[in-house]
Amino acid sequence: MPAERWSYQSTVEMSNEQFLLWQALLENRTGMQISPQRKSFLETSLTIRMREIGCANYDNYYEKLMSGLAGEVEWATLVDRLTVQETSFFRHENSFALVQDYCRRLYEKEGRKHIELWSVGCATGEEPYSLAMGMDDLIKDFPGKRYYGITATDISLPALAKARDGIFSLRKLERVEERFRQRYFEPVERGRSRVVPRLKDRVCFAQLNVLGLGDAPMQNVDVVFCQNLLIYFQRWRKRDIVTKLADRLAPGGMMVLGVGEVIDWHRPDLERVQYEDTLAYLKRKPS
């Protein structure tokens, strides 16, 4: 069927057997759990992509995803479509305030010269750039040299490409304080601004599937920031991911999660941080 004729048709209905097949594929490859209640979301997302490439049905599209290098490229595109990347700068203000207070203490009371942060599930970059703005603003309060580095990871290659570009619409910048907009962004074209190079240089973007955390090179991280990612996973997998993230913390390091994203989870080497409207843990230092 010619691709141009698809636009006149409704969403392709998916059988229960097909749904289970696609559900298993997504969970096995990404850990994402598509519940039966979200079947229509999956149908719509797949149908739109199938129309774009002229694929006739779900079975043919599934086979395409299994076909070598071309399938891997198409898989990267599909994952980008299925992961909701609606994010914003300073999305949860209390969590960013907590990070700044914690890092201030490291610089001020512990005499630290360098702090490492990790943004897990960074999407199109708003989260790590928010962390970078906070850190850059913080270090100017201290005499002498203070440094920081941010690693930002995501499964979506298209999202990472946008993050590396660092170009955002003015609408996206509405939540950014005016002083930060003036200091950390420069206009590039009408209605769009770009992160200034000196801030962009503090963030390293890399692809990472959280199912592969066991092989991730990050170690002894001072701050792990992971919000609006765990909502995609089943409870047992959430716990597994958080446990592996905690393994990457330096002694005394802090992990910041989305409020309400994890329940009934604890580790003896972590203690809950008491900070209003946040969910965070400190890794105890050896006695």
Regions found by a protein language model. Give the residues of each.
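Core SAM-dependent methyltransferase catalytic element
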Residues: 264-287
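Conserved class I S-adenosyl-L-methionine
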Residues: 113-125, 151
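Conserved AdoMet
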Residues: 2-118
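Conserved beta-strand signature within the Rossmann-like core of class I S-adenosyl-L-methionine
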Residues: 251-259
